[in-house]
């Protein structure tokens, strides 16, 4: 289950379109927490959400982003299916701010 093409996730202006985020940051959708942990080092399971902080190279400036996934089934183990729900459009100065944004979604 994924968000229809062209739809925003929560608050417009703070979030990228899901398809744009998948392409820009190479985020998989759907996936599993186990797969994300092998690709990204900053991942937290937070209740029904999985939050990720990632780094994207941009010349001469830091570009950290936050992403929020939600469990798609009742299996909340590392092998449960998760779907991408929100990705920050703003670029953060560090991964801590990116995680804080993702938790707030």
Locate predicted features:
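Intrinsic structural disorder/low-complexity segments
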Residues: 11-12, 79, 100
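Negatively charged, low-complexity tracts enriched in Asp/Glu with abundant Ser/Thr
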Residues: 2-48
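Acidic, low-complexity, intrinsically disordered interaction modules
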Residues: 34-39, 43-97
């Amino acid at each position: 289950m994924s968000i229809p093409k062209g739809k925003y996730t929560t608050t417009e202006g703070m979030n990228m379109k899901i398809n744009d985020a998948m392409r820009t940051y190479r985020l998989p959708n759907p996936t599993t927490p186990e797969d994300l942990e092998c690709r990204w080092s900053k991942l937290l399971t937070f209740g029904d959400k999985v939050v990720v902080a990632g780094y994207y190279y941009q010349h001469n400036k830091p570009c950290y982003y936050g992403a929020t996934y939600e469990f798609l089934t009742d299996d909340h183990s590392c092998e449960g299916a998760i779907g991408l729900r929100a990705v920050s459009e703003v670029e953060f100065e560090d991964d801590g701010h990116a995680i804080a944004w993702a938790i707030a979604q």
